[in-house]
Amino acid sequence: MNVKKYQKQYYMPPVPCMDWAKKDSIEKAPVWCSVDLRDGNQALVIPMSLEQKVEFFKLLVEVGFKEIEVGFPAASETEYEFLRTLIEQDLIPDDVTVQVLTQAREHIIRKTFEALKGCKNAIVHVYNSTSYAQRQQVFKKSKEDILKIAVEGAKLLKELTEEAGEKYRFEYSPESFTGTEPEYALEVCNAVLDVWQPTADRKAIINLPSTVELSMPHVYASQVEYMSKNLKYRNNVVLSLHPHNDRGCGVSDAEMGILAGADRIEGTLFGNGERTGNVDIITVGMNMYMQGVDPELDFSDMPKLCHAFESFTGMSINPRSPYCGSLVFAAFSGSHQDAIAKGMHWIEEKAPDTWTVPYLPIDPTDIGRNYDADVIRINSQSGKGGVGYILETKYGLNLPAKMREAMSYTAKSVSDHLHKELRPDEIFELFKDTFENVTTPYNINGVHFKQLDEGRIEAQVTSNYEGGEYATVYAEGNGRLNAVSNALKQQYNLQYDLVSYTEHALEQSSSAQAIAYVGIKKPDGILSWGAGVDPDIIRASIDALVTAINNR
């Protein structure tokens, strides 16, 4: 790799612009403009059909976008037809403004206005490239020539809007802003604003595209702050950003840019777009949400959004994509699962006003996800907290702590052997197969009790070993389970101590099943566990004891 062929291609403002760094958070949502139907669509291997675009447009409206870029109508007949379809079929709500893109070239601008006939609310977005590299290599024009292109385009927009009797809003982008000298970008933008003369009731949009991301985010923020402080008509200008993600910092560019004075963000759902994509509006919006700031977009049914996006575009969402990927809430690590399980119990008990569960930046249910399928996931790395949480929340089994540990070792061993994640139903079946009502090699066929003096109990226990003949033994104890345990020890010369016993109902009704958990300790100190399920809690406890013995 020849690193010497590369150098910085960005330009810092002529004066320090770091006021944005004094702020630690975004306080309100910007104006959002979706460019999914333009930047997103043109980046697809197979662009969307007219029908898919219409459905995508409806989805964006449903999410809450009030400004939607619908295409470059002069660029192709398909994009022209799409805009005409939206207008002629009256698909644009009164509170939604469509945005159309045009180069600062006369015939393209005129074609764009032709496509807009009959549109009630529109933003006409004109652009030309201003960067040093494009001036030198692509257009071979001077700064004065490039400025003239922008001004002439701005004049034509104003002229055609007046001729049409419309009140379209105007937007200008110095394309490749990040590779443009800030002083020159400011000069061009102010010249355009001088043409448009924006007012409080008809503001102009100045859009600063990170067409190609060239710097660290703080550099972009400083460039944005410089523009915000020095633009003419600033109170009547909506300062917009259009970040791309070439260096993987699109979200940071947007967030720091808002701190630096930006009022508006252009981006896409899930970060779709050319090369590495546009800024992901979902991530920026949800980052605000998790700090208590309303993004003013509805992401409450994220699975629906994901499905629709993949259906329309043919793209797949990365499993690790923030907030929307299939694994973003998943915890496989044992310590993480334990912390989440304890955090969830704390939330249930304390009912606090704010969400603070470890490892979960937001409540997954806020965006249509669920704990069972999305949060606690079991594989060979998982621990007792995760296994216990699944068995308790999904199946109502409140295992003793040490039994949860034993069950987690069993689950991890199976997962490791099969090289796969275990689903909740597979974990439940594994628990039943391993710890519930195991009747081999020892099995009890019948038990009868007799009350003795001083609270003692006599048990008549009929049992067999490995399918052999049944034998009946009598033994005493200080309780029913203790008496049965003594009978089994006597019959089979077993050595263990009964060290743990808990029970609870599995349902809230008079005929509910009960479950008992029994732990025994062998002479070598190893614990063995069993569970018994039966409507009769005495029978359930006996089955649990037998299972623990069989699991030695």
What are these regions (language model features)?
Residues 6, 32, 46-67, 83-89, ...:
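Alpha/beta enzyme core
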Residues 1-106, 370, 375-378, 382, ...:
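N-terminal capping/small domains of soluble enzymes
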Residues 1-38, 292-474, 510-513:
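A mid-to-C-terminal "edge-of-domain" accessory segment
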Residues 215-348:
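Catalytic alpha/beta core domains of metabolic enzymes, predominantly
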Residues 134, 208-210, 238, 266-274, ...:
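Short beta-alpha connecting loops at secondary-structure transitions
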Residues 459-463, 506-529:
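Positively charged, aromatic-enriched nucleic acid-contacting surfaces
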Residues 526-529, 533-552:
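Mixed-charge, glycine-accented linear interaction segment located at domain edges/termini
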Residues 39, 43-44, 73-77, 131-133, ...:
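Short, small-residue-enriched loops and turns at beta-alpha junctions
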